[in-house]
């Protein structure tokens, strides 16, 4: 059985780790390089840096953060935010990233994903999907989700399931799936959406948005069918450590690397 991955996510703004609720009201949570080092030492499987302002602000600082992190951290590093061209990807890979996460630029020009996969390999390409529920069935269960871009501010009218399918066919190596309804709420992942997209594609799906306790990670893997789970504030503010979370998952019969 493939071990499930635990991935701390570092939302970075102007070179600092921040964590907000639904992308607003940001609170400074520290230095990204120090945080990354701590997670590496604790046994995180991977790290994700999201430059949450790069899509509509400056981005040069991020390269420096990636370079300094890669010098000290030896687990796979994914970088997203403001990745718009193959040159952006190349620069991040040269700085020390292992994968690049593409979001708004893929929506704007889906061919970019195909071009990136052809040039760098699917293993370097992650498509980030930020989605909100837009339709419920008569029992109130979520049944349809739409893609939003620009930090959740811009609706696109694109169906999330169809988009995930299309991005897989274009060569994406994995999907980073964030529920904009759940992000920062600490109420757990959007399990119906996670399960629907995990079932719709054959590439790995990383669940994101809404973790408040280890039980939510377990639900994302078990009910959501995710291959990996991503969380931010529960780790940044030391509510739980990576070893605590991994022991909890192992005790609940989830295969993890200890």
Curated annotation (Swiss-Prot):
Keywords: Amino-acid biosynthesis, Cytoplasm, Histidine biosynthesis, Lyase. The keyword Lyase applies. Pathway: Amino-acid biosynthesis; L-histidine biosynthesis; L-histidine from 5-phospho-alpha-D-ribose 1-diphosphate: step 5/9. The active site is at residues 11, 130. Its EC number is 4.3.2.10. The keyword RNA-binding does not apply. One of its GO terms (biological process) is L-histidine biosynthetic process. One of its GO terms (molecular function) is lyase activity. Its main location: cytoplasm. Pfam families: His_biosynth. IGPS catalyzes the conversion of PRFAR and glutamine to IGP, AICAR and glutamate. The HisF subunit catalyzes the cyclization activity that produces IGP and AICAR from PRFAR using the ammonia provided by the HisH subunit. NCBIfam families: hisF (TIGR00735). This is Imidazole glycerol phosphate synthase subunit HisF.
């Amino acid at each position: 059985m493939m071990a499930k991955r635990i991935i701390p996510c570092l939302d970075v703004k102007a070179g600092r780790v921040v964590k907000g609720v639904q992308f607003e009201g940001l609170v400074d949570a520290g230095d990204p390089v120090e945080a990354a080092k701590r997670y590496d030492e604790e046994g995180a499987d991977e790290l994700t840096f999201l430059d949450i302002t790069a899509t509509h602000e400056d981005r040069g600082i991020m390269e420096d953060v990636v370079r300094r992190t890669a010098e000290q951290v030896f687990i796979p590093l994914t970088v997203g935010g403001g990745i718009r061209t193959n040159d952006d990807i190349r620069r991040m890979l040269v700085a020390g990233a292992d994968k690049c996460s593409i979001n708004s630029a893929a929506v704007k020009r889906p061919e970019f994903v195909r071009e990136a996969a052809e040039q760098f390999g699917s293993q370097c390409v992650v498509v980030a999907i930020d989605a909100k529920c837009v339709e419920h069935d008569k029992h109130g269960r979520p049944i349809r989700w739409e893609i939003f871009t620009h930090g959740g501010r811009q609706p696109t009218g694109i169906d999330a399931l169809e988009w995930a399918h299309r991005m897989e066919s274009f060569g994406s190596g994995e999907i980073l799936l964030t529920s904009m309804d759940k992000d920062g709420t600490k109420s757990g992942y959007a399990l119906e959406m996670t399960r629907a997209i995990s079932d719709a594609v054959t590439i790995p799906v990383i669940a994101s948005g809404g973790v408040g306790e280890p039980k939510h990670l377990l639900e994302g893997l078990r009910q959501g069918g995710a291959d990996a789970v991503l969380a931010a504030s529960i780790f940044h503010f030391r509510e739980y450590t990576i070893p605590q979370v991994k022991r909890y998952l192992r005790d609940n019969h989830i295969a993890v690397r200890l």
